[in-house]
Every structure is written in structure tokens, then in C-alpha cells.
Amino acid sequence: MFPWLRLFAVGLSLIGKSKVDLLATTRVRLRVWPNDLDFNLHVNNGRYLALANIGGAHWFVRTGALGIFRKHKAFPVIGGAIAKFRHDLKAFQTFEIHTRLIGWGSKWAFFEQRFVRKERVLGVVAVRAVAKAQSGSIDPQVLIAELGHNAPSPELPEWVRRFDQSAELLGELLRNEERSKVVDQHSMSALGQERTYAVQTATSASHLIATAKAAACTRSYLLHPRQRTCAVQTPMSAKGQ
């Protein structure tokens, strides 16, 4: 089933369901369909991220976070993800996605999503997400407080801190590469302008010299009409060749 249809079906299943605590683990049950499979006849690695989005949407509704986001006209943006695959999911097997909020900082909130079948963890997806609004990013603590949770974030596990650090380092690397490309483009543009100016200057100088020689030749002919005409190309005649 296409993820959007799955998402719609999950939304219908949530009608009338009560809210759960912000730090509770939400569970949504799904089934593997043929379009989830790759050539090895198990769920494609990239498909796990699409399925994890469904688990994330389920968490947003069950905890009431969706209403708070709407109030602020904000939307969640994933700024990094890692995945660990342990066992296969095959066609038509049922499984659950267990989603929980691990903790948060001044910008990012961290989620863990486990793919579970018969109480066995088949894989894990972890993401860091930020709340975006027209005014910019919203501090997670502001949104979490509006959900009635005033306590500080639980301590982040070591692997989550390393994941966050790795994402920051990679982001900085990409930003530096973009800056280098911009500098290189500006340098090439400036070099091209310098070359164009040099060519224009040389051309202007050549025209001035040719014009001066033509004027001297004309003056000599007027003073000494019986002498042979000077063989000097004027700028106009040079251009026509």
C-alpha cells in the first residue's frame, strides 16, 4: 500500500483515541506490501524511512503535538537520520513501529523508532527534528511546555549525542564546501572581468596607434603629394579584413 494511503488509514484508526504522555512510546501496526520490497524480496532499506514517517505522524497525533504545531503554524523538519538494520521484513508480514521521544536540546528533538515483530527488534531508525515556523526555528522546550511537560529533557544517551555531533560536523563540512564554491565562482568571475578589461584596453590602444599613424600619413601626403602614399591601415580598414 502506498505510504499516503497507509497514513490515511492510520489517521482513521486514531479517531476517538485518547492522548498519551509526551514521553510514552506509541505503537502503530502495519503490514509489508509487495511495493515495499527490493530485489532481495525484503523491505528496501530506504523504505524504512518512509515507514518511520508514518510512525512519527502517529506519535504527533497521539501525544497532541500536532495541535500545538498548528497553533504556532509550524511544521516538523528532519535534520538528520541514522538507521540500524538487524533482521529482514518480508512480504505480507505484520510489524509494529514503536516511536518515542528520547530528549531535546535548544534546537533539536531526538526520536527513536523501532521496527518490532513478535517482540523482536528488526531495525531502528533515529532522527533529529526541528520545529519550523515563518519566524524561524522554535525552541522545543516552548512546545513541550505547552503540552504540559515542564520538566527538563531526559539525559541523552551517548549514542544520541554522538549522532548529533556527527550530523553537526557533516553539516559544517557541506556549508564549507558551498562557501568554497561561491568563492571560486567569484574568483573566476573577477578573473574573467580582468581579462575582458585587458583585451578592451589593448584593442583601444591599437586603435589609437593606428589612427595616429593614419593621421601622420595623411598629413605627409598633403604636404608632399608627389610622394607615394603611406601603407598604413586605419582602424576601420583593419576591422574590415
Which residues are covered by each model-predicted region?
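HotDog/MaoC-like acyl-thioester-processing domains
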Residues: 1-16, 22, 89-96, 100-184
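Short structured motifs
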Residues: 14, 79-86
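Short amphipathic
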Residues: 24-33
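Active-site helix/loop of acyl-thioester processing domains in fatty-acid/polyketide metabolism
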Residues: 47-70
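Short, intrinsically disordered C-terminal tails of secreted or membrane-associated proteins
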Residues: 233-240
